[in-house]
Amino acid sequence: MGTKWSKSSLVGWPEVRRRIREAPTAAEGVGEVSKDLERHGAITSRNTPETNQTLAWLEEMDNEEVGFPVRPQVPTRPMTYKAAFDLSHFLKEKGGLEGLVYSRRRQEILDLWVYHTQGFFPDWQNYTTGPGTRFPLCFGWCFKLVPLTEEQVEQANEGDNNCLLHPICQHGMEDEDKEVLVWRFDSRLALRHIAREQHPEYYKD
């Protein structure tokens, strides 16, 4: 019986079906805009700069000089487990993040760079609360934030070459728990979603 969906229409369908199945889904722990991008392929009207902090921040960055364009050169998409995992290993191999003192501004620069070059909407790099080690909410991201001891902070502050505005000289002023945090790579974070185990309440829709 002839219908629009005849056998000839199914040519190539197995490949399309495979691609649909393999299409990456947003990683657990991403923000509301990334969930929109996964579900609808676009940012919906429920997320605006007035209702979403990350969108408001991106709008603000448009008007600020940050050293590179803040408009993505590729389509905006949600961070996936595989992309977070690959990015973690790329940054570990290239160096620059491991052991770097964390600050909100440094996170913003990293988020903007990833958004600009890869298109991943910058609501994926969030961490559990302190005190102590902060684990990433986004499953696949293998960098956690680890507090330095007072002795480590004092050693890092020795000498005359320290800038007062450097995050380590702020002695944790930016942190609610007054801890100086550094990024640390931990490959186990790709296997165990520690943030979800410790804080299941963060993952309720």
Curated annotation (Swiss-Prot):
Residues carrying Phosphoserine: 6
Ranges in coiled-coil conformation: none
Gene Ontology BP annotations: symbiont-mediated suppression of host antigen processing and presentation of peptide antigen via MHC class I; symbiont-mediated suppression of host antigen processing and presentation of peptide antigen via MHC class II; symbiont-mediated suppression of host autophagy
Region (Binding to ATP6V1H): 148-180
SUPFAM superfamilies xrefs: Regulatory factor Nef
Induction entry: Expressed early in the viral replication cycle.
Top-rank taxon, per record: Viruses
Comment text on domains: The N-terminal domain is composed of the N-myristoyl glycine and of a cluster of positively charged amino acids. It is required for inner plasma membrane targeting of Nef and virion incorporation, and thereby for infectivity. This domain is also involved in binding to TP53. The SH3-binding domain constituted of PxxP motifs mediates binding to several Src family proteins thereby regulating their tyrosine kinase activity. The same motifs also mediates the association with MAPK3, PI3-kinase and TCR-zeta.
Protein name: Protein Nef
Organism of derivation: Simian immunodeficiency virus (isolate CPZ GAB1)
